[in-house]
């Protein structure tokens, strides 16, 4: 029993470290707390299947699309948390933060750019939120292409966006680069089209009622 307790404690510490390293905006997000409503296009059985993380081992891409406030960020982070529980390294970030991170590292000219690129390319599960909320530069388009090229068929990726893939195209500098990036993300991806009420308003009303 003591050995089992020690093993469980070690595992808990590993999970806690993975959650910390993932840099979730909401570290408490978990699939158990995902809200399923009649007017919300989110299937519990599908989320539970994704939470088993088999698709991560297959290096698949999951794309979550919804308008602002529908809870896509929570769902994405909940899936990331499920991966951490299975001892899978995760990184949560926003596309704008990736661009800023790489731009600063490139300007520093101290070798950190290559280290950061390697980290984005190699983490087992990369969660990219707010994808193409704003247009990205030619240089950042190249960065994104290099990341997705390295991950394709080797690492799993989740993309969360307010926009459909055909709208991403208009926010990437260069037609050829846009084609190359979208082909690696959108083709063959699993899609979750999340529609429903504004979840911020839903929880605000719920708190007032309580």
Feature annotation, model-predicted:
Residues 59-75:
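Walker A/P-loop nucleotide-binding motif
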Residues 1-26:
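Interdomain "pre-motor" coupling segment immediately N-terminal to P-loop NTPase/helicase cores
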Residues 61-63, 125, 156:
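Residue-level preference for the first positions of well-ordered beta-strands
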Residues 81-93:
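Post-Walker A helix-loop "phosphate-sensing" segment adjacent to the P-loop in P-loop NTPases
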Residues 51-59:
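Phosphate-binding P-loop
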Residues 29-51:
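N-terminal pre-Walker A segment at the start of P-loop NTPase domains
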